[in-house]
Every structure is written in structure tokens, then in C-alpha cells.
Amino acid sequence: HMKYLFLVIALFIGPVCMAHSDENFIKSDLFGNLGERDKAAILIIHFGTTHDDTRVLTIDAINAKMKEAFPGIEVREAWTSRIILKKLKERGVERLNPTQALIQLHEQGYTHILIQSTNIIEGTEMKELRREVEGLSLNFKDIRVGNPLLYAPEDYAVVVKAITEAMNQADSCLLYTSDAADD
């Protein structure tokens, strides 16, 4: 198991060097600040998939967990991959991109939006999402974008611990891969 632990740690050394700190964040309760006429929603941002079986096990499962964790708050989704959105549209399946979803939420009277992406790192996809949100932020009283899974240095330690514990309980080998990021 030590060689697997070493591999996991090695995989995370590079990204840890790019981690961010929380110095620029102010903690406050988005949903606790709602007025009588305010409406809140959570918008989950996914890259997307064209495979229904995969979607059920991943995206739909995440959405369901979010709805369970935040009862009484509207939970929506948006997908970022233009290629996937195009392929789905050709099959007659409509999904919204983040801009479309935010416009729809605004038109439906939502005032407070929490956006959480399923991206792993603060890379190109997250930067693009933050730009899109910034362009529409004046439509809402409060709109916030949550950090990706691996953002601050301590996030890496939590993930390495979870992976290590999962490996210790597994009877099989686990393979970890990463998509290259140019930033």
C-alpha cells in the first residue's frame, strides 16, 4: 500500500503548489440573509456527459445529494461542454449552459444564487465560469461561486486522506488519472 500512497502524494504535489488561500474570502450565510420576497437557488455546474448510464451514477447522484442537503432551496444544473450540449441537442435533449441557466433563474425571480461547480481544480473551466457569472451578477442581489474541490492547500490533505482510507478498505487496485490543465 505504501507505493500507492506515494503515487497519490506524487500526483498531488504539483497541483498543491498552485493552491490558493482563503485570504480574500469573507464568510457569510447566503441563505440566512434572505428577505421576505427573496428567492434562493443553487446552480450546480457540470462539464456534462452524453452517456445516460454515467449521468445517472454521477451528475444525477450529485444533484440528488445537493437537494437532500438543502431542502427548501431550488436546485438546478447547467452544463459547460459545448460539444456535449450540441450532441444532446441532436438527440432532442435540451440542457442549459451556465449563462442560460442564470438568465432563466433571473426571469423566474430568483435573487440569491449559490453556484457550485463539480470541477476539481481552479483551472480554465473555473475561470471561464467566474467570468460568465461576473457578467450577469447585477441581475441578482447576491450571487456566489463556490470553490472547486482542490482549491486551498488543506483541501489536498483532506482528499489524500479520503483516498488513502478508501484504498485501505478496497480489495482491488485503484487507478487515478488527471486531465492536463494548461494553467
Give the role of each language-model region:
Residues 46, 80, 89, 94, ...:
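A structural feature that tracks compact, well-ordered secondary-structure segments
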Residues 91-104:
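Glycine-rich, highly charged phosphate/nucleotide-binding loops
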Residues 5-13:
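Sec-dependent N-terminal signal peptides
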Residues 52-78, 126-138:
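Extended intrinsically disordered, low-complexity coil regions enriched in Ser, Thr, Gly, Ala
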Residues 176-181:
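Conserved small/polar residues in nucleotide/adenosyl-binding loops
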Residues 73-90, 150-151:
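Short connector loops at secondary-structure junctions
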Residues 19-21:
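Boundary at the C-terminal end of the N-terminal hydrophobic targeting segment
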Residues 102-156, 160-166:
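Hydrophobic, ordered structural segments
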